[in-house]
Each structure stands twice: as structure tokens, then as C-alpha cells.
């Protein structure tokens, strides 16, 4: 499966637009508690533990996106948008969402 944030794939011809596909993952409140408890892990202004959790959430969201695209018979997803939103009571959770257009390509 190919992924692109652009509306086209260079060197590939899109033959069919299959529809919009999405994927979401939510990090619970414990990630924020763990993040602040592990503030000592911050090196150079970055938290390895927090970045690891965000990476995992992004991977889950992309896996859902890919699953939906495959179900539509697509070979690629173009125009991908990645968003991060706080949700829940007191904005205690972080949602990672990805969306794009599933497409079929000429072989």
C-alpha cells in the first residue's frame, strides 16, 4: 500500500477513486500522567516516552486507514491529512486521526 500527502503519485496513474478512508487512535489520560511523571526522560527538550506513544498512536491510525483502503480494493491512499486533537473531559485525551482518498492505480 502506498501513502501520500499529495493528491497524486508521481509516475503512477490513478484509474479509480474508491472513497474517503480514515483511521483514529486515542491516547488516554494515563499517557499525560506518565508523561509528567517521566519528565526526567526529557533530553534536549524532547520526551522519548511521549514521542513513542504518539508514534504508536499514529501507527494504529495508519493501520486502520490501510485496512479500510484494502477493503475497497485500493492500492494507495492519497491526499493524506494527519490531525492531533485533545478530547474528553478537561481535554485529558489526545486523538490522532488520519484521512485520505483510497485509489486504484494502473499497473
From Swiss-Prot:
SUPFAM superfamilies per UniProt: YbjQ-like (SSF117782)
Signal peptide (UniProt feature, chain positions): none
PANTHER family membership: UPF0145 PROTEIN YBJQ (PTHR34068:SF1)
Stated family: Belongs to the UPF0145 family.
Protein name, entry field: UPF0145 protein ETA_21660
Organism this protein belongs to: Erwinia tasmaniensis (strain DSM 17950 / CFBP 7177 / CIP 109463 / NCPPB 4357 / Et1/99)
Amino acid at each position: 500500500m502506498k501513502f501520500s500527502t499529495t493528491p497524486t503519485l508521481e509516475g503512477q496513474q490513478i484509474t479509480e477513486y474508491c472513497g474517503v478512508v480514515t483511521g483514529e487512535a486515542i491516547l488516554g489520560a494515563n499517557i499525560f500522567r506518565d508523561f509528567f511523571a517521566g519528565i526526567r526522560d526529557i533530553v534536549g527538550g524532547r520526551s522519548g516516552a511521549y514521542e513513542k506513544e504518539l508514534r504508536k498512536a499514529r501507527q494504529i491510525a495508519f493501520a486502520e486507514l490501510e485496512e479500510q483502503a484494502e477493503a475497497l480494493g485500493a492500492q494507495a491512499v492519497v491526499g493524506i491529512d494527519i490531525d492531533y486533537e485533545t478530547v474528553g473531559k478537561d481535554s485529558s485525551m489526545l486523538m490522532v486521526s488520519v484521512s485520505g482518498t483510497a485509489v486504484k492505480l494502473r499497473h
